[in-house]
From Swiss-Prot:
<dbReference type="Pfam" id="PF00215">
    <property type="entry name" value="OMPdecase"/>
</dbReference>
<feature type="binding site">
    <location>
        <position position="122"/>
    </location>
    <ligand>
        <name>substrate</name>
    </ligand>
</feature>
<feature type="binding site">
    <location>
        <position position="10"/>
    </location>
    <ligand>
        <name>substrate</name>
    </ligand>
</feature>
<dbReference type="InterPro" id="IPR011060">
    <property type="entry name" value="RibuloseP-bd_barrel"/>
</dbReference>
<feature type="binding site">
    <location>
        <begin position="59"/>
        <end position="68"/>
    </location>
    <ligand>
        <name>substrate</name>
    </ligand>
</feature>
<feature type="active site" description="Proton donor">
    <location>
        <position position="61"/>
    </location>
</feature>
<comment type="subunit">
    <text>Homodimer.</text>
</comment>
<dbReference type="InterPro" id="IPR047596">
    <property type="entry name" value="OMPdecase_bac"/>
</dbReference>
<dbReference type="InterPro" id="IPR013785">
    <property type="entry name" value="Aldolase_TIM"/>
</dbReference>
<feature type="binding site">
    <location>
        <position position="32"/>
    </location>
    <ligand>
        <name>substrate</name>
    </ligand>
</feature>
<comment type="pathway">
    <text>Pyrimidine metabolism; UMP biosynthesis via de novo pathway; UMP from orotate: step 2/2.</text>
</comment>
<keyword id="KW-0456">Lyase</keyword>
<feature type="binding site">
    <location>
        <position position="193"/>
    </location>
    <ligand>
        <name>substrate</name>
    </ligand>
</feature>
<feature type="binding site">
    <location>
        <position position="184"/>
    </location>
    <ligand>
        <name>substrate</name>
    </ligand>
</feature>
<keyword id="KW-0665">Pyrimidine biosynthesis</keyword>
<dbReference type="GO" id="GO:0044205">
    <property type="term" value="P:'de novo' UMP biosynthetic process"/>
</dbReference>
<protein>
    <recommendedName>
        <fullName>Orotidine 5'-phosphate decarboxylase</fullName>
        <ecNumber>4.1.1.23</ecNumber>
    </recommendedName>
</protein>
């Protein structure tokens, strides 16, 4: 895939996206399309990004019975996206079905979209895990278990906090992707995410791709913020 920086386009409409992308004209990005944008604009927004030369992570976090996920992935594969995801909590058979659907739906001669599994959302903390989700194991152990299950199910990697990337690499190997949201500059608000790190720390912890949204999309100068991201990832001292 392309750059290690995945820009989360959490906008409600195509118009808002176009306004944001204007300063990046001619610069191929790796963009994340989540539920908010995809449910409003549908497959047409994916086609627009691909025509502009951007890589696309379609972040719908599928979690359903295996056959439903298989058929959904079969359709998503035809869109030409580069990366999709499911919830690891859906279990091994569901994750295997996701890969089966992608294999069946990918056009002849095209590369199958990579598929990663969400371990635990970066808005989840130990209290929520135990008291609300009723999972007794510690957060790190739960993430590690889900990562191993995802790998055994044929996933290409996981979505995890950068704080768990080292643990996952040790258990699953260097080639197993760690895609890490919850990325903020040191002087940013953490908003609704509780497990956050800076770009430079994420790289040091073993992240392959970092997902960053509001720090770029809500910046007064998004292009300058993106340049700062590149600088910090490469060891710059602005943190």
């Amino acid at each position: 895939m392309h750059t290690p920086f995945i820009v989360a386009l959490d906008f409600p409409s195509k118009h808002d996206v176009q306004q944001f992308l204007r300063p990046f004209s001619g610069t191929p990005l790796f963009v994340k399309v989540g539920m908010e944008l995809y449910y409003q604009e549908g497959p047409a927004i994916i086609a627009m990004f691909k025509e502009q030369g951007h890589a696309v992570f379609l972040d719908l976090k599928l979690h359903d019975i295996p056959n439903t996920v298989k058929q959904a992935m079969k359709g998503l594969a035809r869109l030409g996206v580069d990366l999709v995801n499911v919830h690891a909590a859906g279990g091994r058979r569901m994750m295997e079905a996701a890969i089966e659907g992608l294999d069946a739906g990918t056009p002849s001669g095209a590369a199958r979209p990579r598929c990663i599994a969400v371990t635990q959302l970066t808005s989840t903390d130990e209290r929520m895990l135990h008291e609300e989700l009723w999972i007794s194991q510690p957060l790190e152990e739960t993430v590690s278990h889900y990562a191993a299950l995802a790998q055994a199910s044929g996933m290409d990697g996981v979505v995890c906090s950068a704080n768990e990337a080292t643990l996952i690499k040790e258990r699953c190997g260097a080639s197993f992707l760690a895609v890490t949201p919850g990325i903020r500059f040191a002087d940013d608000s953490v908003h609704d995410q509780v497990r956050v790190v800076t770009p430079r720390k994420a790289r040091a912890l073993g992240a392959d791709y970092i997902v960053i949204g509001r720090s770029i999309t809500r910046a007064a100068d998004p292009l300058a913020a993106y340049s700062r991201l590149q600088h910090e990832w490469n060891g710059g001292e602005t943190e």
